Amino acid sequence: MSDEEEDSVSEGFSASEDEWKPSKDVKGGESSDDDDSDFDELQAEGGAAGSSGRSSAVAGKRGDHKAPSGIKGSSVKKRKPTGQSLRSKLYNKYRPPPKTFPTSPSQQKENTPRASGSKNAKTPNESGARNQHGPADSSSESSVEDYLVNPADLDLHSTFFAGGQKEKSPAPQFDCNAGITNLSDSGSEDNNESSFEDKAGNAFDFRGLLENANSLERTRDALSKRNVTATPPRSQAATMDVNALLALGENQNYQSVEVEEREGNQRKKAGRGAPAAPPTLDEPSRLSKTKSTRIKRHTKTRPVSTVVANAGDTDDSDFEEVADADLSSDQDDGETPNISGDLEIRVGLEGLRPTKEQKTQHELEMALKRRLNRDIKDRQILLHKVSLMCQIARSLKYNRLLSESDSLMQATLKLLPSRNAYPTERGTELKYLQSFVTWFKTSIKLLSPNLYSAQSPATKEAILEALLEQVKRKEARCKQDMIFIFIALARGMGMHCRLIVNLQPMPLRPAASDLIPIKLRPDDKNKSQTVESERESEDEKPKKDKKAGKPAEKESSKSTISKEAEKKNNAKKAEAKPLSKSTTKGSETTKSGTVPKVKKELSLSSKLVEKSKHQKAYTSSKSDTSFDEKPSTSSSSKCLKEEYSELGLSKKLLKPTLSSKLVLKSKNQSSFSSNKSDTSFEENPSTSSSSKSLKEETAKLSSSKLEDKKVASPAETKTKVQSSLLKRVTTQNISESGDSKKPKVAPVDTFSPVAGRTRRATVKPKTEEKPQVVGSPVIPKLMLSKVKQLNAKHSDTENASPANKHLQEQRNTRETRSRSKSPKVLISPSFLKKKSDGADSTSDPQKHQMAPETKARISPNFLSEALPARQLRSRGQKASSLAIPQLDGGDDVPLPKKRPKLEKLKNSQDSDEVFEPAKPVKKAPVLPKSVQNLRKDRRVMSTDDEGGSRLNRKTDASDMWVEVWSDVEEQWICIDLFKGKLHCVDTIRKNATPGLAYVFAFQDDQSLKDVTARYCASWSTTVRKARVEKAWLDETIAPYLGRRTKRDITEDDQLRRIHSDKPLPKSISEFKDHPLYVLERHLLKFQGLYPPDAPTLGFIRGEAVYSRDCVHLLHSREIWLKSARVVKLGEQPYKVVKARPKWDRLTRTVIKDQPLEIFGYWQTQEYEPPTAENGIVPRNAYGNVELFKDCMLPKKTVHLRLPGLMRICKKLNIDCANAVVGFDFHQGACHPMYDGFIVCEEFREVVTAAWEEDQQVQVLKEQEKYETRVYGNWKKLIKGLLIRERLKKKYNF
């Protein structure tokens, strides 16, 4: 291509292009690399905008395999074009300049005329080049204006302005394509130098094109391997960017042209086969001609560290590596950073300490958070106090209503069977109370097991009407109404009966979620006091999923699947665990695939279902179960069956391993929960449904037992043996229960997977039925002698299953008959002396015939259709002839002929006693390791359940009961009406809501008494700390405390003995603030043990335990003086502590850590006031008289509270002193409080008379001042009116 053609192609480029043409001498006559033209054009089309118009012929002339030769001496030969590789050309072409530096016209190392305008571009001998090529300055002038430089950026000290070196400078090296990104229509990128070489006739080198293609593939393979094994491209690209930016500010001084020529020759050799050596900092950068001018303005040298060169590769192969990395970084932003465009680098200094401003800001934030948390806590305390007062007021209202309502008492007295039902002359006895409670329980039916009714009346009249209506129908809507009816009846009969309420106010402390999280250190997350933020938790989710996938992989590794298949299914297995946990809620939906895959997913999910079931049962056994926790067992078993049906598995796929593990786990679960929990009747239906589902499942598994043997693995056969051993143990227990008197376990079917279940597990599934009116299905204990034996046998019969109970009742028939003949079992005949025939006709005729008519017993109609084995034979034969008539002769509401069955009684949720847990199995079967591993993690699974039960309180909790005073026993007797028990503190504590912190007794004289110490087992340790401060509570209930009687004194002594007889606490923390015991380490600053050799009550960890009575308060001399006591002479301080900081007026500093001597009460004596002599009042150092107590008044003086007496005494020249009665702290200091004056006795009358005269004079003066002010105001008003009238007359306005 000729020079004219080349100029026509690049007509829009630069007007000063002819200036840059070097001399016509060409060294070597080498042509450019035209073989790279095609590849370069392809790269240019995929690269930056603005290069689309370039022709392939011109673009191919950019690259050259060989390095440029240096300029020899001062010869005016044309320099050979710089030998830049294709890698450097495209790398610099598509790399925009960094954001942080201003752009400059061109590079310094290129030695172009435009580079001289840059501040950093110091091109030597540039002026000489201009002189040599001056005639070519007449091309386009418009392009020159685009590259004009601000004169402020010129470097006047550069060699450009040195005139002596103009002729010696070599021809400059230039780049015609500099700034090509700013030209949109440019089609030519080569200078005249490349066209001159084109004329030389050099041939194309096609080998370079093939080498470029091969190196491209090799580079891609190397990069793909490097992404997997070596450091990611992100780090490499970041290193390149940092090195490039570090080179921006370096100023290079070229030493000589010979050094440049020598280094160019070295690059030639390196490009032909030798490994590329890193150039020095002074070496010119091998930047491409196609690179943007902005890069060349900033970058004089590009370090070789930015280019990765492989041994044996050409320069073009080196380019392929870097370019491929850059292109891949643009395509995949997730792996490598985007190094194009504006770039900012921020280096995080994590190891440095925070600055003072950051510390101040952090401390301020922490202070604000602490203040807000304190406000939240204070607000919660106020809510606690308000709710407590509201509940106290409500209970007082109902107690007053029951005592003042005569109509309610009259209505309840009509319920009595005879006039002889009142207490005897001896008073209330235990025998009478037991008969009375049993009769009342059978007479009044309980409709709902809830404590409160659904609709509670608002006014007193509505409450009375509701109670009267229930008394008339002989039924109670809820437990509260039944208790109210009993209290009204007992008080009407003359017994001392009081209402006991377990108050449940709002929590004393707010929940942790309600507080603002406070971190002790901003960077330390482990020491934070609260949980992390939601964003942090979301970031940690993938980490947890990876950890959760590890156990799944371990389980699947036991199967025959290859390792490659495991890697492919890792993600699915990691999701198997959360999916299987969600099956307990019935939300799992899985898809069936191949047979081995389904088997493994089934094994994982079923194991996790078992784990959740076992842990839910464990948590429900520890705490009193609530309504939310009850459906858990049934839902888990139903979800297990639904899981099998959804998977679409045949019986062959149901492995014996799953069945055996389910059997073992369910047996362990039921026995463990029955041992620890006081399960309520709401929990039993769920147990029955779970047992039913397990039975159906095991029946299916047993039907396909032969087919399972073919599929079972060695681990499954091992579990089979354990399940068979378990069945043997259960059958042995059944056989032993038939022979022994006390059954150990309940009989279980051979196909039943449940061992040690309660009776409810064997009952048929419940059918939907209408709610019926039922009473309490518990047979009360009427025997008052041999209480321990009866309790043991009673608990055995309750815990056994129906079949075992039937056998036990048959064995104990004789014993039951002998007991039933005892008069203690019966209500006295006088209590039920009169009967009505009409009531007898309502009973069952068959039972009436079987019952003996000679004795009157308690009516068992409320258990007429209970399980036959549950009833005693002597009582089961009793007819309804024992129905109790009414005194008023009114028609009674007839009882139903048939009582509901035992299942209905259980479903009615009326009693807790029937469903007490069974006895624990002594020899439990050996559990598999999988079950033991699951037990370790149950605490994590139980947190959600415990939190839910804590929020939802049980609606059937018995937080109300009754206490009756026994004259014979001389104590208050607690009664559980719903179970018919007396002296049942433990039963009441179990049935009440946990946390008995406020148990108050509301007596018949409208007074209030705190009886928490009787019912709270941990009153002295934990519950006492859960209450509000004692001072506030005492002040609140003080108006409602009755006068102290003999009964109160006796009760207080009993309450004190309850805790004094208990053993010592087991931990050191429980001794802190204990009301009875103390450790020396827990003594406060002003406390001490006296006597010094106080007797020890025990030891804990080698530390002596003392009585709280030995702890005494110690005070300093000044504090004892305020109590009118002084330290005895010669007494040594019992203890020396650090005094509080004091302000020294002389030095105006705060004195700290001064020793303070403190003394005990036994080291002090009463204060003896001094005597006034010669009319002078004795004073202290401050001129005042300390009168903290009346006894501290000095002798022969009087205390006169007359204001202004000091002024009168000064006039009369009589000694007088101020009386200090205390100190007040305000305005940041302590100020004395004065009250009156102290004068001698002989001056009392004189001073008093003078003060009265002075008061009269003061009154006259005040009157004169008042009159003067009034007259003066009138005078001003009159004068003002006169002036106004005069102005009106004068100016007419």
Curated annotation (Swiss-Prot):
One of its GO terms (molecular function) is damaged DNA binding. Residues 1-199, 217-239, 255-341, 514-640, 658-919 are annotated as: Disordered. GO terms for cellular component: cytoplasm; cytosol; nucleotide-excision repair factor 2 complex; nucleus; XPC complex. The keyword ATP-binding does not apply. Residues 288-301 have a biased composition (Basic residues). Heterodimer. Involved in DNA excision repair. May play a part in DNA damage recognition and/or in altering chromatin structure to allow access by damage-processing enzymes. This is DNA repair protein complementing XP-C cells homolog.
